[in-house]
Design a protein with these regions (language model features):
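Alpha-helix boundary/N-cap detector
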Residues: 5, 9, 152, 256, ...
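Preference for solvent-exposed, low-hydrophobicity sequence contexts
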Residues: 216, 220-328
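Short helix/strand-capping turn motifs
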Residues: 179-225, 232-233, 238-241
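Charged alpha-helical initiation segments
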Residues: 1-46, 52, 56
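Internal, well-ordered interaction modules that form the hydrophobic cores of assembly/scaffold domains
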Residues: 46, 127-171
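A generic secondary-structure signal for well-formed alpha-helical elements
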Residues: 50-61, 162-172
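Amphipathic, Lys/Arg-enriched alpha-helical patches that create a basic surface
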Residues: 151-199
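Short non-catalytic regulatory patches outside canonical folded cores
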Residues: 51-133, 138-144
Length: 328
């Protein structure tokens, strides 16, 4: 029996309370420094959830639940320098980006709309993130630290909790068939305030040997910023590879048996190291290319599906080898 998710309902209730603020405050770029006791309370509640959830995720990653100090004595487990630091090592979580997308939040400046709420969250004191400094301040001295209980700090704390919840849920979402599909992934992922940054790994250079290096162009910084990866599901990826291999075998047979190609290469030996496509185009243009290159298996596929995968930096696609070496 699946373990019930106790964290998401709490997060959704915090979202509701935040959005109630927007009924009374016009939350725009020049209003983010507004502070109040109620906002302070929301920051504390939100941060308590962050502490609990970070420890859950730390445990799921095999973190040491009984750390020791320099003397070898068991010490408390710290949610930031222990738990969030491990999440940073595994998932690069400080670089994960979200967008404020609620229709009743009127934030137009990029610094208020595009958030990196986990940035420096694994640090302590003045080196840590501003929302975490605000949490510690209002928790221990609310009267003198109330000005730190701002909408901006609350929004960042909410964003940090949102990201942790997505990683805790660890959902793989079926987007549906590529062929004749009008479905898209809803990157709000259940939130009424935020949208998670996504990257697309669906532009692939087909080859006999397939893995993540076939994603073109390389995802680079987009992968670092992304919480979800839009990709072909593994079954479809394997089917695409199989169809490519079948088509390429036929293409090679046609190429090797073509009198036009043989004649051209005998007259132009400098082309022998070129690709099949380049040789065909030089020897006979588009018409020869269309007669040589086979696409019947690849073009006939109609069941290819896409999915949204949580980005854990653990690889996107399986490694696939040429048919002659599969399983050898």
């Amino acid at each position: 029996m699946a373990t019930p998710n106790l964290y998401w309902p709490v997060y959704k209730n915090l979202e509701k309370e935040f959005l109630k603020l927007a009924d009374y405050i016009h939350i725009s770029d020049d209003q983010t420094s507004i502070y109040s006791m109620h906002i302070a309370d929301l920051i504390v509640r939100c941060s308590v959830e962050i502490e609990a959830l970070s420890k859950e995720l730390y445990s799921s990653l095999g973190g040491n639940m009984t750390p020791t100090d320099t003397n070898g004595d068991v010490r408390d487990l710290y949610f930031d320098t222990d738990c969030l630091d491990l999440l940073e090592q595994k998932w690069h979580i400080s670089k994960k980006e979200i967008t404020v997308s609620a229709i009743n939040l009127y934030l137009t400046e990029e610094k208020h709309r595009l958030l990196l709420p986990r940035h420096k969250a694994n640090k302590r004191g003045t080196s840590g993130s501003k929302w975490k400094q605000a949490y510690q301040a209002v928790k221990h001295d609310r009267r003198n630290s109330l000005k730190k209980a701002t909408i901006e700090n609350l929004l960042h704390a909410m964003g940090a909790l949102y990201i942790l919840n997505l990683y805790y849920k660890d959902e793989r979402t079926d987007i549906g068939r590529v062929y004749l599909s009008d479905h898209n992934f809803d990157n709000r992922a259940g939130s009424e305030i935020f949208s998670a940054h996504c990257c697309h790994a669906t532009c692939i250079a087909m080859a006999y040997h397939m893995d993540d290096s076939c994603i073109s162009p390389p995802l680079g910084d987009e992968l670092e910023r992304s919480i979800y990866i839009i990709k072909y599901d593994d079954k479809s990826f394997r089917e695409m590879h199989k169809n490519f291999c079948l088509d390429f075998q036929i293409t090679e047979q046609r190429f090797n048996n073509s009198p036009e190609i043989a004649k051209f290469l005998s007259e132009h030996p400098e082309y022998k190291d070129k690709s099949i496509n380049e040789i065909c185009l030089a020897a006979g243009g588009d018409s020869l290319l269309m007669r040589i290159v086979c696409m019947q298996h690849s073009m006939g596929e109609r069941s290819t599906r896409m999915e949204a995968l949580l980005n854990k930096h653990s690889g996107i696609y399986p490694e696939l080898l040429p048919p002659t070496t599969q399983g050898s």
